């Protein structure tokens, strides 16, 4: 613990806490200040000036990052018949119906993405208390309730991320791994920022992005200039 604290202090010394860095500078600093002994995740966190209590100011969706996430996603699909076979052929890790519901209710959660065909939502709905709090519940807005299960599986395996503003207007997501080339992280960051910018509600007033931070697993937060894109 003492060694980790020393490493964090050393990393913090390289960052000017009073400065908002450009995208390129922030990515370079994130790679430089990373001290994790594993391939750390690179994440971004936005604070948006929105009121999620208003229906027209709720921000939620999904996108495929240009260079993927670097993370191997374990995909679970609720489907039957031909659609179940499509999911398996597309590379889904787990495919089933009631058997998976029982397994999940028993405490099994070894998956990262849940996809379902519309006709399966009646049984998937029984998992709301388990999947909902973990942001795993299939939803049409994120493309995880669909008849095109093959496409959904392929996108999830190929770098698809989902995002959602919480009650305080915070949106967090992964944009890659520290091992990525800096230009690939920058490209992913810019692609996600474009999505957030376009999602600005017409009724939102004042400064839209009030705070933007880039960080790595265990690493310090680096403030990013939202106008540097």
Curated annotation (Swiss-Prot):
Gene Ontology process terms (BP): regulation of translation; translation
MF terms in GO: rRNA binding; structural constituent of ribosome; tRNA binding
Statement: the UniProt record of this protein carries the keyword rRNA-binding: yes
Keyword terms of this UniProt record: Repressor, Ribonucleoprotein, Ribosomal protein, RNA-binding, rRNA-binding, Translation regulation, tRNA-binding
InterPro entries from the UniProt entry: Ribosom_uL1_bac-type, Ribosomal_uL1, Ribosomal_uL1-like, Ribosomal_uL1/biogenesis, Ribosomal_uL1_3-a/b-sand, Ribosomal_uL1_CS
UniProt cross-references to CDD domains, sorted A to Z: Ribosomal_L1
Name of a matching Pfam family: Ribosomal_L1
Example of a GO cellular component annotation carried by this entry: large ribosomal subunit
Ribosomal protein among keywords: yes
Family label: Belongs to the universal ribosomal protein uL1 family.
Cited function: Binds directly to 23S rRNA. The L1 stalk is quite mobile in the ribosome, and is involved in E site tRNA release.
Subunit structure: Part of the 50S ribosomal subunit.
Protein name, as recorded: Large ribosomal subunit protein uL1
Protein species of origin: Streptococcus mutans serotype c (strain ATCC 700610 / UA159)
Source taxonomy: Bacteria, Bacillati, Bacillota, Bacilli, Lactobacillales
């Amino acid at each position: 613990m003492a060694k980790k604290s020393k490493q964090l202090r050393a990393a913090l010394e390289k960052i000017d806490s009073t400065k908002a860095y450009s995208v390129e500078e922030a990515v370079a600093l994130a790679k430089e200040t990373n001290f994790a002994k594993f391939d750390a995740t690179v994440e971004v966190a936005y604070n948006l000036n929105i009121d999620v209590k208003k229906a027209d100011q709720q921000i939620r969706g999904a996108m495929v990052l240009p260079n993927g996430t670097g993370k191997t996603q374990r995909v679970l699909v609720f489907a039957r018949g031909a659609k179940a076979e499509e999911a398996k052929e597309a590379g889904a890790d787990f495919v089933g119906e009631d058997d998976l519901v029982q397994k999940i209710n028993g405490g099994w959660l070894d998956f990262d993405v849940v996809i379902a065909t519309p006709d399966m939502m009646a049984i998937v709905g029984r998992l709301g208390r388990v999947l909902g709090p973990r942001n795993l519940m299939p939803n049409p807005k994120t493309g995880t309730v669909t008849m095109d299960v093959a496409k959904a599986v392929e996108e999830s395996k190929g770098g698809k991320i989902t995002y959602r503003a919480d009650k305080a207007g915070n949106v967090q997501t992964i944009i890659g791994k520290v091992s990525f080339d800096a230009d690939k992280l920058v490209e992913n960051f810019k692609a996600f920022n474009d999505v957030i910018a376009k999602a600005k509600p017409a009724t939102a007033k004042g400064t839209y992005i009030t705070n933007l931070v880039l960080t790595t697993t265990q690493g310090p937060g680096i403030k990013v200039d939202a106008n540097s894109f």
